[in-house]
Amino acid sequence: EIMPSLVGSEMCIRDSLYGGAISGMDWQTIGDSVRSYRYQYDGLGRLTSADYLESGHSSDRYVTEYSYDLMGNILTLSRSGKVYDKIYGITDDLTYQYDGNRLIRVTNHAADTPAYKDAMYYVDGADLDTERTYDANGNMTSNADSRISRISYDALNMPCRIDYIDGSHIDYTYAADGVKQRIDYYLNPYTSSLPDDDCGTACDSSLLVHTWREYAGNCVYVCDTLNMILINGGYITFDYTTHQPIYHYYLKDYLGNNRITVSLADGHIEEVNHYYPFGGLMGDSRNATTQPYKYIGKELDRTHGLDWYDHGARHYDPVTGRWNTMDKMCEKYYLSLIHISEPTRLGM
C-alpha cells in the first residue's frame, strides 16, 4: 500500500509473509533518498534482522540483528547508527542476562560510544553482576547503567519518583485512575542536559534546577505556560507575539508512528523521525525535539537520558526493547482455549 503525503513523502509496505508479518518497508521525504528495511524472522515469527537500504542499495548505516531465548527474551542485539556527524558505525552490541524473565544486566561491547547527541543508543554506565533490581510486583526499582539509584511506585504500580545518583530526581503525579497529571524535574545542571523547552528555576537545593510539565485533558503546560493542545492527528501551539493558533499535523506510517510534523501555517516540514525496529530514533532524524509524541504516537521522555515512552499503563524502553513494569492485564485470561483471537464459538 502507498500512503501519499501533501509534502512529498511516501510510505510503501512490502509484500506480507504468509504468517502476516511484514517483509519490508520503504519511506522517503523531500530532499532525501528512499530508505528501506527488509525484515527476516525465525521459525517462531520473531524478528532476527532488519537489513537497511538507501536508494535500493544495501547500507550498513542502520542495520540491526537480534537473537532470543526460548521464552522470547532478547539475548543479543546489534545495532548500527550515527556515531558522529556523517560518520556511522556499530553503536550497540548488546548481550542480555536474565534471572528468569527479569533482565538484570546489559553489556554493550561496541568499541566506540556515540558522540552524536541526537542518536539513540544504549549507555553502559556500570559493570556489575546485577545492574537492575525489581520489587515483588516485577517493577524495575533501579538501573545502574542509567545511573538510576531508585524508582518508587504508587499503589497502582505507576512510577512516582525516579532518583539518580547525581541527586537529580523526577516526580510523577497521577489522578486516582492512574492518568498522568504532572511531571516535576529536579536536575543537576552539571551532570544532565536540560530540556529544550526549559524554563527551570533554582529550587531549595542550589545544585538542582526545577522544571515541570502539567497535563489537563488535551492541554499540555510547561512551567505554567500553555505549550500545546493535542488534537486528532496533531497539535496546536500559539504565536508568542500575536497569540494566534498555529496548527501542526502528523504524517503517520502503518503503525501510527509520527514520521513527519507539518506546520499548516506555511506547509513546511518541521520534524522528520526515522525509527529503528522496536521504536528507537535514528540519528538522521531531523529536529526530533520539536515535539515529544513519536513511536505509535506515544510521548517520549529523553530528559536526563531516560528515553522512555509513556504508554499510559506503563513505560517502554525502545533501546533495549523491554517494558519496565509488568502488564497489569497479563493474568486476565478468557475462559477459552484460544485467548488472543477472542473466539465465540470455541468458548468453554
Give residue ranges: language-model regions.
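Short glycine/serine/proline-enriched coil/turn segments at secondary-structure junctions
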Residues: 31-32, 56-58, 302-305, 332-334
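Short turn/helix-capping motifs enriched in Asx and small/polar residues
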Residues: 265-281, 304, 312-314, 318-345
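A cytosolic small-molecule/anion-sensing beta-strand core signal
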Residues: 7, 155, 254, 317
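Acidic/glycine-rich beta-solenoid
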Residues: 9-10, 14-176, 181-248, 285-294
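Single conserved hydrophobic/aromatic residue that forms the stacking wall/gate
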Residues: 1-13, 338-348
